[in-house]
């Protein structure tokens, strides 16, 4: 997979939601040793869903521009807006 980085990577916060620079595609990297729950919300503040991010893993997440991400705890999940192609 080829990715194009569209912004600076930053830590996903447990205290606030982020659209990840209004991203449609997000690279999510978890560098810690414990699993975390990532919650996806809509622009109105309602939860769309959540998933468990395994420790020492990475994934590519597709979302709507106004959807937000938040981690349950910790400072070891990083996100960045990207474009990609297979």
Task: Give short role names for the model-derived ranges.
Residues 1-86:
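Surface-exposed, low-hydrophobicity beta-strand/loop segments enriched in small/polar/acidic residues
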């Amino acid at each position: 997979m080829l990715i194009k980085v569209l912004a600076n990577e930053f830590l996903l916060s447990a205290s606030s939601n982020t659209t990840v620079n209004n991203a449609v595609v997000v690279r999510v990297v978890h560098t810690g040793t414990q699993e975390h729950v990532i919650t996806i919300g809509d622009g109105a503040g309602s939860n769309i869903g959540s998933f468990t991010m395994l420790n020492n893993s990475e994934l590519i997440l597709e979302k709507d521009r106004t959807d937000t991400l938040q981690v349950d705890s910790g400072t070891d999940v990083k996100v960045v807006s990207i474009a990609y192609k297979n």
